[in-house]
């Protein structure tokens, strides 16, 4: 299962943020985290964008 996880680059995240603004960036990141992609900031995004804190079970980031 870990082979399905892809780390998003800062450029990928920044591109979405500047092109779509905060709401689009939040929903895009939520979708990517839920699909197994992880920028290393999924916990931050859940708490910052949606006010929800998820437990990652270890590595400091959230994987669905």
Curated annotation (Swiss-Prot):
The keyword Signal applies. Bacteriocin with a narrow antibacterial spectrum. Antibacterial activity against the Gram-positive bacteria L.plantarun, L.pentosus, L.curvatus, L.lindneri, L.mesenteroides and E.faecilis. Lacks antibacterial activity against the Gram-positive bacteria L.brevis, L.sakei, L.lactis, P.acidilactici, B.subtilis, B.cereus, L.monocytogenes and S.aureus, and against the Gram-negative bacteria E.coli and S.typhimurium. Contains 2 disulfide bonds. Stable from pH 5.5-8.5. There is a cross-link at residues 61-64 (Lanthionine (Ser-Cys)). Its main location: secreted. GO terms for cellular component: extracellular region. Thermostable, activity is retained after incubation at 90 degrees Celsius for 15 minutes. The gene is bactA1. One of its GO terms (biological process) is defense response to Gram-positive bacterium. It is found in: Secreted. This is Bacteriocin plantaricin ASM1. Keywords: Antibiotic, Antimicrobial, Bacteriocin, Disulfide bond, Secreted, Signal, Thioether bond.
